[in-house]
Amino acid sequence: ASDVYKRQYLYSTNGVSNDDTTTDKKKVVVIGSGPNRIGQGIEFDYCCVHGVSSLKENGYEAIMINSNPETVSTDYDTADKLYFEPLAWNEVKAVLNREKPDSVIIQLGGQTPLKLAKNIHDAGFSIAGSSLEVIDSTEDRDLFQKLCSKQNIKQPLSRIANSEVELVDSVNHIGFPVLLRPSYVLGGRAMR
């Protein structure tokens, strides 16, 4: 039999029996980046593919959740199981409740899975790697700046601005060139 028949593509349905296979391996779910957008997405898919590959090499059952059929992470031979699902909490929660993974990896898929961190944590699932608090401190620009200063990590001169007046004052203090970035955004559409 072709290897394609040994892989599972899974789609959610209601009111039907469960006919997927199970293993004795520890399960880890990787949440992908979803749709690619100009300037965002491909690098996160690359991270997810390598994460899934490492999980499989180390004896874990690698389960991928992603909504983009045009990515490498959704190829038939990448993960042990693949769920084509919107990367919204209700759909992700349904997969997690069904699979009962030992842990969930959200750090490889960019901003989309990071936005699910609190929900995943509050639902009692283990987030692999960074804790919810650490994730928050890296996404909040002010907290991250303070963390770097506390650890004596060199960083570019920066300021936090919460108004247009503070922004102009900060730019005048720092000088050009200047990079403006909001908290809790890596890039893409949310940069508006």
Regions found by a protein language model. Give the residues of each.
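Active-site nucleotide/adenylate-binding loops and adjacent lid/helix of ATP-dependent enzymes
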Residues: 97, 135, 139-192
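Short, small-residue-biased leader/transition segments that mark boundaries at the very start
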Residues: 1-5
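Glycine-rich phosphate/diphosphate-binding loops that line cofactor/substrate pockets in enzymes
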Residues: 19-28, 96-100, 171-174
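A short, GP-enriched loop/loop-strand-helix hinge that lies immediately N-terminal to
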Residues: 38-44, 52-61, 65-79, 101-139, ...
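A structured beta-alpha segment of the ubiquitous adenosine-cofactor-binding alpha/beta core
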Residues: 88-98
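C-terminal accessory/binding modules appended to enzymatic or scaffolding proteins
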Residues: 7-10, 14-51, 56-61
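Structural recognition of alpha->loop->beta junctions
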Residues: 75-85, 89
